[in-house]
Amino acid sequence: MARILGVEIPGNKPLISALPVIYGIGRSRAKLICEQAELNPQMRAKDLTNQQINRIIQVIEENGFVVEGDLRREIQQNIKRLQSIRCYRGIRHIRGLPVRGQRTSTNARTRKGPRKTIGVVRRKEAKKGKV
């Protein structure tokens, strides 16, 4: 298994499928990295030499791709900024509701979490069968 930018790349996969394991690199960026590093996209990650790994890292840094921890931190800071200025999107993040205008009267279960069932309190007489 090759280690690129602190991430273990699965060795049995081709580069075009293995590079997207890195957070911030998708299939199109993986293809671009392979072209610029002059590597065959179908080459297995386990067959990479140290020189080729260094070339991949160099291409990622030269293009200014923000990946892994830096990207996660940047996204988190953007959300915190929205929350601190109390804009609509920030308030939606705070309340745990959909941010991009989706409906919430029904659906939105992923964002809202599982349903919270609310029980009904009944009078003691109603339990005994008396009205």
Swiss-Prot record:
Residue ranges that the Swiss-Prot or TrEMBL entry lists as coiled coil: none
Keyword annotations: Ribonucleoprotein, Ribosomal protein, RNA-binding, rRNA-binding, tRNA-binding
PROSITE patterns: RIBOSOMAL_S13_1, RIBOSOMAL_S13_2
tRNA-binding recorded as keyword: yes
Highest taxon above the source species: Bacteria
SUPFAM superfamilies: S13-like H2TH domain
Record bears the keyword RNA-binding: yes
InterPro entries listed in its UniProt record: Rbsml_uS13_C, Ribosomal_uS13, Ribosomal_uS13-like_H2TH, Ribosomal_uS13_bac-type, Ribosomal_uS13_CS
GO CC, alphabetical: cytosol; small ribosomal subunit
GO MF annotations in UniProt: rRNA binding; structural constituent of ribosome; tRNA binding
One annotated GO biological process: translation
The protein's assembly and partners: Part of the 30S ribosomal subunit. Forms a loose heterodimer with protein S19. Forms two bridges to the 50S subunit in the 70S ribosome.
Family assignment from sequence similarity: Belongs to the universal ribosomal protein uS13 family.
Role description: Located at the top of the head of the 30S subunit, it contacts several helices of the 16S rRNA. In the 70S ribosome it contacts the 23S rRNA (bridge B1a) and protein L5 of the 50S subunit (bridge B1b), connecting the 2 subunits; these bridges are implicated in subunit movement. Contacts the tRNAs in the A and P-sites.
Protein name: Small ribosomal subunit protein uS13
Source species of the chain: Methylacidiphilum infernorum (isolate V4)
Originating gene: rpsM
